[in-house]
Regions:
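Low-complexity, Gly/Ser/Thr/Pro-rich intrinsically disordered linker/tail segments
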Residues: 343-346, 357-374
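Core segments of small alpha/beta cavity-forming domains
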Residues: 24-102, 220, 258
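N-terminal capping segments
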Residues: 196-279
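Surface-exposed, charged secondary-structure patches
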Residues: 91-143
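Short beta-strand edge/turn micro-motifs at domain boundaries
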Residues: 22, 146-200, 342-347
Protein backbone atom coordinates (compact mmCIF):
# COMPACT_ATOMS: atom_id res chain seq x y z
CA UNK A 1 0.00 0.00 0.00
CA UNK A 2 1.24 3.47 -0.79
CA UNK A 3 0.90 6.38 1.57
CA UNK A 4 1.28 9.83 0.15
CA UNK A 5 2.05 12.46 2.69
CA UNK A 6 0.75 15.51 0.90
CA UNK A 7 0.99 18.92 2.34
CA UNK A 8 -1.99 20.78 0.98
CA UNK A 9 -2.84 24.48 1.02
CA UNK A 10 -6.48 23.56 1.56
CA UNK A 11 -5.70 21.89 4.91
CA UNK A 12 -5.37 24.57 7.55
CA UNK A 13 -7.01 23.29 10.73
CA UNK A 14 -4.53 24.07 13.49
CA UNK A 15 -4.13 21.95 16.61
CA UNK A 16 -1.40 22.90 19.09
CA UNK A 17 0.26 20.38 21.36
CA UNK A 18 2.90 20.43 24.11
CA UNK A 19 6.11 22.42 23.70
CA UNK A 20 4.39 25.00 21.49
CA UNK A 21 7.53 27.11 21.49
CA UNK A 22 9.01 24.60 19.04
CA UNK A 23 5.96 25.11 16.82
CA UNK A 24 4.33 28.12 15.19
CA UNK A 25 1.77 30.27 17.00
CA UNK A 26 -1.37 31.40 15.20
CA UNK A 27 0.06 34.91 14.91
CA UNK A 28 3.32 33.59 13.44
CA UNK A 29 1.39 31.62 10.83
CA UNK A 30 -0.73 34.65 9.91
CA UNK A 31 2.39 36.80 9.63
CA UNK A 32 4.15 34.28 7.41
CA UNK A 33 1.05 33.85 5.25
CA UNK A 34 0.74 37.61 4.71
CA UNK A 35 4.45 38.38 4.19
CA UNK A 36 5.74 38.95 0.69
CA UNK A 37 9.43 38.54 1.52
CA UNK A 38 11.32 36.57 -1.11
CA UNK A 39 8.27 34.51 -1.96
CA UNK A 40 8.20 35.65 -5.58
CA UNK A 41 11.77 34.51 -6.28
CA UNK A 42 11.70 31.23 -8.18
CA UNK A 43 15.45 30.90 -7.66
CA UNK A 44 15.05 31.00 -3.87
CA UNK A 45 12.13 28.58 -4.03
CA UNK A 46 14.22 26.16 -6.09
CA UNK A 47 17.08 26.34 -3.58
CA UNK A 48 14.87 25.50 -0.64
CA UNK A 49 12.92 22.90 -2.60
CA UNK A 50 16.14 20.88 -2.88
CA UNK A 51 16.87 21.27 0.84
CA UNK A 52 13.37 20.23 1.86
CA UNK A 53 13.26 17.30 -0.55
CA UNK A 54 16.39 16.01 1.17
CA UNK A 55 14.74 16.55 4.56
CA UNK A 56 11.60 14.62 3.63
CA UNK A 57 13.68 11.92 1.96
CA UNK A 58 15.54 11.37 5.24
CA UNK A 59 12.27 11.31 7.17
CA UNK A 60 10.93 8.70 4.78
CA UNK A 61 14.09 6.64 5.19
CA UNK A 62 13.67 6.77 8.96
CA UNK A 63 10.21 5.20 8.61
CA UNK A 64 11.42 2.49 6.20
CA UNK A 65 14.48 1.64 8.31
CA UNK A 66 12.72 2.04 11.65
CA UNK A 67 15.50 4.36 12.84
CA UNK A 68 14.68 7.83 14.20
CA UNK A 69 18.40 8.61 14.53
CA UNK A 70 18.37 9.49 10.83
CA UNK A 71 16.32 12.59 11.63
CA UNK A 72 19.03 14.23 13.72
CA UNK A 73 20.95 15.64 10.74
CA UNK A 74 18.35 18.38 10.36
CA UNK A 75 18.35 19.64 13.95
CA UNK A 76 20.79 21.18 16.44
CA UNK A 77 20.06 19.24 19.61
CA UNK A 78 22.00 21.79 21.66
CA UNK A 79 19.36 24.41 20.86
CA UNK A 80 16.25 23.84 22.96
CA UNK A 81 13.60 24.72 20.36
CA UNK A 82 15.39 22.65 17.70
CA UNK A 83 15.64 19.73 20.14
CA UNK A 84 11.91 19.97 20.85
CA UNK A 85 11.13 20.05 17.13
CA UNK A 86 13.26 16.92 16.67
CA UNK A 87 11.60 15.12 19.59
CA UNK A 88 8.16 15.91 18.18
CA UNK A 89 9.04 14.59 14.73
CA UNK A 90 10.79 11.51 16.16
CA UNK A 91 7.66 10.67 18.15
CA UNK A 92 5.51 10.83 15.02
CA UNK A 93 8.00 8.72 13.08
CA UNK A 94 8.02 6.16 15.88
CA UNK A 95 4.23 6.03 15.69
CA UNK A 96 4.37 5.02 12.02
CA UNK A 97 6.91 2.35 12.91
CA UNK A 98 4.71 1.07 15.75
CA UNK A 99 1.59 1.09 13.56
CA UNK A 100 3.37 -0.98 10.90
CA UNK A 101 4.28 -3.55 13.56
CA UNK A 102 0.67 -3.72 14.74
CA UNK A 103 -0.50 -4.13 11.17
CA UNK A 104 2.25 -6.66 10.30
CA UNK A 105 3.37 -4.56 7.34
CA UNK A 106 6.62 -3.15 6.02
CA UNK A 107 6.91 0.29 4.45
CA UNK A 108 9.05 0.65 1.32
CA UNK A 109 9.91 3.15 -1.40
CA UNK A 110 8.56 6.30 0.25
CA UNK A 111 8.82 9.36 -1.94
CA UNK A 112 7.99 13.02 -1.30
CA UNK A 113 7.19 15.78 -3.76
CA UNK A 114 7.68 19.24 -2.25
CA UNK A 115 5.87 22.32 -3.54
CA UNK A 116 7.24 25.56 -2.08
CA UNK A 117 4.50 28.15 -1.65
CA UNK A 118 6.48 30.88 0.06
CA UNK A 119 9.97 31.69 1.38
CA UNK A 120 10.46 34.69 3.69
CA UNK A 121 13.81 35.80 5.09
CA UNK A 122 12.82 36.76 8.64
CA UNK A 123 16.31 37.90 9.57
CA UNK A 124 19.78 37.26 8.15
CA UNK A 125 20.17 33.51 7.82
CA UNK A 126 16.67 32.64 9.14
CA UNK A 127 13.98 31.67 6.64
CA UNK A 128 10.29 30.95 7.13
CA UNK A 129 8.88 28.52 4.57
CA UNK A 130 5.38 27.38 3.68
CA UNK A 131 5.30 24.23 1.58
CA UNK A 132 3.01 21.50 0.34
CA UNK A 133 4.37 17.97 0.45
CA UNK A 134 3.19 14.83 -1.32
CA UNK A 135 4.74 11.67 0.11
CA UNK A 136 3.95 8.28 -1.37
CA UNK A 137 4.34 5.29 0.92
CA UNK A 138 4.27 1.74 -0.35
CA UNK A 139 3.73 -1.07 2.10
CA UNK A 140 3.19 -4.78 2.00
CA UNK A 141 2.01 -7.39 4.48
CA UNK A 142 4.90 -9.52 5.66
CA UNK A 143 3.12 -12.74 4.71
CA UNK A 144 2.57 -11.50 1.13
CA UNK A 145 5.56 -9.28 0.20
CA UNK A 146 4.76 -9.31 -3.52
CA UNK A 147 1.45 -7.49 -3.03
CA UNK A 148 2.02 -3.74 -2.72
CA UNK A 149 -0.62 -1.38 -1.33
CA UNK A 150 -0.84 2.40 -1.71
CA UNK A 151 -2.42 5.48 -0.11
CA UNK A 152 -2.03 9.24 0.21
CA UNK A 153 -2.12 11.67 3.12
CA UNK A 154 -2.19 15.49 2.96
CA UNK A 155 -0.39 17.99 5.19
CA UNK A 156 0.61 21.67 5.06
CA UNK A 157 3.99 22.69 6.55
CA UNK A 158 5.31 25.86 8.15
CA UNK A 159 9.06 25.57 8.79
CA UNK A 160 11.79 27.85 10.10
CA UNK A 161 15.23 27.00 8.68
CA UNK A 162 18.31 28.66 10.17
CA UNK A 163 21.74 28.77 8.55
CA UNK A 164 24.14 26.85 10.80
CA UNK A 165 27.63 26.70 9.35
CA UNK A 166 27.45 24.96 5.99
CA UNK A 167 23.91 23.62 6.47
CA UNK A 168 20.42 24.60 7.59
CA UNK A 169 18.70 23.32 10.73
CA UNK A 170 15.02 23.26 11.68
CA UNK A 171 14.27 25.56 14.60
CA UNK A 172 10.47 25.45 14.35
CA UNK A 173 7.92 23.41 12.45
CA UNK A 174 4.17 23.05 12.40
CA UNK A 175 2.02 21.05 10.02
CA UNK A 176 -1.51 19.73 9.77
CA UNK A 177 -0.85 16.74 12.00
CA UNK A 178 -2.47 13.48 10.88
CA UNK A 179 -1.12 11.71 13.97
CA UNK A 180 -2.20 14.08 16.74
CA UNK A 181 -4.55 11.44 18.17
CA UNK A 182 -2.34 8.46 17.50
CA UNK A 183 0.86 8.48 19.47
CA UNK A 184 -0.15 5.78 21.98
CA UNK A 185 0.10 2.36 20.35
CA UNK A 186 0.66 0.17 23.41
CA UNK A 187 -3.07 -0.33 23.94
CA UNK A 188 -3.67 -2.03 20.57
CA UNK A 189 -0.54 -4.03 19.76
CA UNK A 190 -1.19 -7.74 20.14
CA UNK A 191 -0.60 -11.01 18.32
CA UNK A 192 -4.35 -11.63 18.26
CA UNK A 193 -4.96 -8.46 16.25
CA UNK A 194 -2.08 -9.17 13.89
CA UNK A 195 -3.14 -12.78 13.32
CA UNK A 196 -6.72 -11.76 12.58
CA UNK A 197 -5.70 -9.08 10.08
CA UNK A 198 -3.35 -11.31 8.10
CA UNK A 199 -5.96 -14.09 7.98
CA UNK A 200 -8.26 -11.91 5.88
CA UNK A 201 -8.56 -11.34 2.15
CA UNK A 202 -10.05 -8.47 0.18
CA UNK A 203 -13.71 -9.23 -0.64
CA UNK A 204 -15.26 -9.08 -4.07
CA UNK A 205 -17.05 -5.79 -4.50
CA UNK A 206 -19.23 -4.57 -7.36
CA UNK A 207 -20.66 -1.11 -6.64
CA UNK A 208 -23.82 0.13 -8.29
CA UNK A 209 -23.65 3.29 -10.40
CA UNK A 210 -24.57 5.69 -7.58
CA UNK A 211 -21.96 4.24 -5.27
CA UNK A 212 -19.26 4.22 -7.93
CA UNK A 213 -19.99 7.87 -8.67
CA UNK A 214 -19.65 8.66 -4.96
CA UNK A 215 -16.28 6.89 -4.80
CA UNK A 216 -15.09 8.74 -7.91
CA UNK A 217 -16.15 12.08 -6.44
CA UNK A 218 -14.31 11.37 -3.18
CA UNK A 219 -11.10 10.48 -4.98
CA UNK A 220 -11.33 13.52 -7.27
CA UNK A 221 -11.97 16.23 -4.67
CA UNK A 222 -10.19 14.90 -1.56
CA UNK A 223 -7.41 17.48 -1.97
CA UNK A 224 -4.79 14.82 -2.69
CA UNK A 225 -6.14 13.35 -5.90
CA UNK A 226 -3.82 11.18 -7.97
CA UNK A 227 -5.08 13.16 -10.96
CA UNK A 228 -2.57 16.04 -11.06
CA UNK A 229 -5.27 18.41 -12.32
CA UNK A 230 -7.06 18.09 -8.99
CA UNK A 231 -4.16 17.65 -6.56
CA UNK A 232 -4.39 20.26 -3.77
CA UNK A 233 -7.89 21.24 -4.93
CA UNK A 234 -11.36 20.98 -3.43
CA UNK A 235 -14.63 21.43 -5.33
CA UNK A 236 -14.89 25.21 -5.76
CA UNK A 237 -18.70 25.02 -5.57
CA UNK A 238 -18.32 24.58 -1.82
CA UNK A 239 -16.70 26.78 0.79
CA UNK A 240 -13.58 25.32 2.38
CA UNK A 241 -14.52 25.15 6.07
CA UNK A 242 -11.10 24.09 7.32
CA UNK A 243 -10.36 27.60 8.67
CA UNK A 244 -13.72 27.47 10.50
CA UNK A 245 -12.82 24.30 12.39
CA UNK A 246 -12.95 21.50 9.85
CA UNK A 247 -14.25 20.42 6.46
CA UNK A 248 -14.67 16.67 7.03
CA UNK A 249 -18.48 16.56 7.36
CA UNK A 250 -18.89 19.03 4.49
CA UNK A 251 -16.87 16.71 2.26
CA UNK A 252 -18.70 13.58 3.46
CA UNK A 253 -21.98 15.33 2.63
CA UNK A 254 -20.68 16.30 -0.82
CA UNK A 255 -19.74 12.68 -1.51
CA UNK A 256 -23.30 11.59 -0.73
CA UNK A 257 -25.03 14.41 -2.63
CA UNK A 258 -22.76 15.20 -5.59
CA UNK A 259 -21.55 11.64 -6.08
CA UNK A 260 -24.21 9.40 -4.59
CA UNK A 261 -27.25 11.50 -5.60
CA UNK A 262 -28.69 11.69 -2.07
CA UNK A 263 -31.26 14.49 -2.11
CA UNK A 264 -30.97 17.56 0.11
CA UNK A 265 -33.77 18.37 2.55
CA UNK A 266 -34.56 20.86 5.29
CA UNK A 267 -32.32 19.18 7.85
CA UNK A 268 -29.44 18.26 5.54
CA UNK A 269 -28.77 21.15 3.18
CA UNK A 270 -26.16 23.47 1.67
CA UNK A 271 -26.98 26.73 -0.10
CA UNK A 272 -23.69 27.53 -1.83
CA UNK A 273 -22.14 29.45 1.05
CA UNK A 274 -23.16 27.65 4.20
CA UNK A 275 -24.94 24.53 5.34
CA UNK A 276 -27.04 23.05 8.11
CA UNK A 277 -25.54 21.41 11.18
CA UNK A 278 -26.28 17.99 9.70
CA UNK A 279 -24.28 18.93 6.59
CA UNK A 280 -21.28 20.65 8.18
CA UNK A 281 -20.85 19.32 11.72
CA UNK A 282 -19.33 15.88 12.36
CA UNK A 283 -21.62 15.08 15.30
CA UNK A 284 -24.64 16.51 13.48
CA UNK A 285 -23.83 14.54 10.32
CA UNK A 286 -23.55 11.23 12.17
CA UNK A 287 -26.77 11.84 14.12
CA UNK A 288 -28.68 12.88 10.99
CA UNK A 289 -27.59 9.90 8.92
CA UNK A 290 -28.66 7.47 11.63
CA UNK A 291 -31.83 9.32 12.62
CA UNK A 292 -33.03 9.72 9.03
CA UNK A 293 -32.65 6.03 8.24
CA UNK A 294 -30.09 6.73 5.54
CA UNK A 295 -27.51 4.82 7.56
CA UNK A 296 -27.26 2.23 10.36
CA UNK A 297 -24.67 0.99 12.83
CA UNK A 298 -22.18 -1.77 12.10
CA UNK A 299 -20.28 -1.40 15.40
CA UNK A 300 -18.92 1.16 17.84
CA UNK A 301 -16.23 1.17 20.50
CA UNK A 302 -12.48 1.36 20.86
CA UNK A 303 -10.18 -0.30 18.34
CA UNK A 304 -9.96 -3.59 20.20
CA UNK A 305 -13.75 -3.81 20.16
CA UNK A 306 -14.38 -2.93 16.51
CA UNK A 307 -11.39 -4.11 14.45
CA UNK A 308 -13.06 -7.41 13.50
CA UNK A 309 -16.37 -5.76 12.61
CA UNK A 310 -14.50 -3.21 10.48
CA UNK A 311 -13.94 -5.92 7.87
CA UNK A 312 -17.72 -5.80 7.27
CA UNK A 313 -17.48 -2.20 6.05
CA UNK A 314 -17.81 -1.50 2.34
CA UNK A 315 -17.06 1.54 0.18
CA UNK A 316 -19.68 4.21 0.75
CA UNK A 317 -19.85 3.53 4.49
CA UNK A 318 -18.26 5.98 6.91
CA UNK A 319 -16.30 6.07 10.15
CA UNK A 320 -17.15 8.64 12.83
CA UNK A 321 -14.35 9.22 15.33
CA UNK A 322 -15.32 10.01 18.93
CA UNK A 323 -13.06 11.86 21.35
CA UNK A 324 -14.13 12.90 24.85
CA UNK A 325 -17.75 12.00 24.13
CA UNK A 326 -18.05 13.99 20.89
CA UNK A 327 -17.73 13.03 17.23
CA UNK A 328 -14.78 15.08 15.99
CA UNK A 329 -14.13 13.64 12.53
CA UNK A 330 -15.82 11.83 9.62
CA UNK A 331 -14.10 9.70 6.97
CA UNK A 332 -15.73 7.86 4.08
CA UNK A 333 -14.67 4.32 3.19
CA UNK A 334 -13.70 4.25 -0.50
CA UNK A 335 -11.67 1.05 -0.84
CA UNK A 336 -9.84 -1.92 0.70
CA UNK A 337 -6.23 -2.95 0.91
CA UNK A 338 -5.03 -6.44 -0.03
CA UNK A 339 -6.31 -7.88 3.28
CA UNK A 340 -9.70 -6.22 3.00
CA UNK A 341 -8.72 -3.57 5.55
CA UNK A 342 -11.02 -0.54 5.10
CA UNK A 343 -9.42 2.53 3.52
CA UNK A 344 -10.88 6.00 4.02
CA UNK A 345 -10.85 9.26 2.10
CA UNK A 346 -11.54 12.64 3.74
CA UNK A 347 -10.62 16.27 4.31
CA UNK A 348 -8.57 17.71 7.21
CA UNK A 349 -6.08 16.23 7.17
CA UNK A 350 -6.60 15.26 3.51
CA UNK A 351 -6.52 11.51 3.04
CA UNK A 352 -6.85 9.28 -0.01
CA UNK A 353 -7.39 5.56 0.63
CA UNK A 354 -5.75 5.56 4.07
CA UNK A 355 -6.24 2.72 6.62
CA UNK A 356 -9.14 3.91 8.76
CA UNK A 357 -7.29 3.73 12.11
CA UNK A 358 -3.98 5.29 11.02
CA UNK A 359 -3.79 8.50 13.02
CA UNK A 360 -6.46 7.39 15.52
CA UNK A 361 -4.68 5.01 17.88
CA UNK A 362 -4.97 6.67 21.30
CA UNK A 363 -6.95 4.77 23.91
CA UNK A 364 -9.54 7.56 24.28
CA UNK A 365 -10.64 7.27 20.64
CA UNK A 366 -13.86 5.40 19.85
CA UNK A 367 -14.85 4.36 16.34
CA UNK A 368 -18.43 4.46 15.05
CA UNK A 369 -18.60 2.20 11.99
CA UNK A 370 -21.69 3.13 10.00
CA UNK A 371 -23.26 1.57 6.91
CA UNK A 372 -24.85 3.91 4.36
CA UNK A 373 -27.96 2.70 2.52
CA UNK A 374 -27.32 3.43 -1.15
Amino acid sequence: MLITLISSPVSKVIAYTEKESSSFTKDEIKTLESSSGTGTSEKVKAEFKGLLEKLFSERNEAVVCGDCELLKNFYDLNIKVSLWAYESEAKKTQYLINWSEKQYVQFKDLKSNVKIRKVVEKEPGLFGIICDVATDFNYYYLDSPDVINHFRLGTNHYINLKKNGDKYIITKEWYTDPFADSLDMDNIKSDEIKDYIISRNAPEFNPNERLQNAINYAHKYCGVSEDEEFTFKYNSKYKNHNPDGGDCANFASQILHEGGNFKKNGAWNYDGKDGTKAWLNAQGFKNYMLGSGRASYIAKGNYNKVYKAAFNMRPGDFVAYEKKGRITHISTVTGFDSKGYPLVTCHNTDRLLVPYDLGWSNSNIKFHLIHVHY
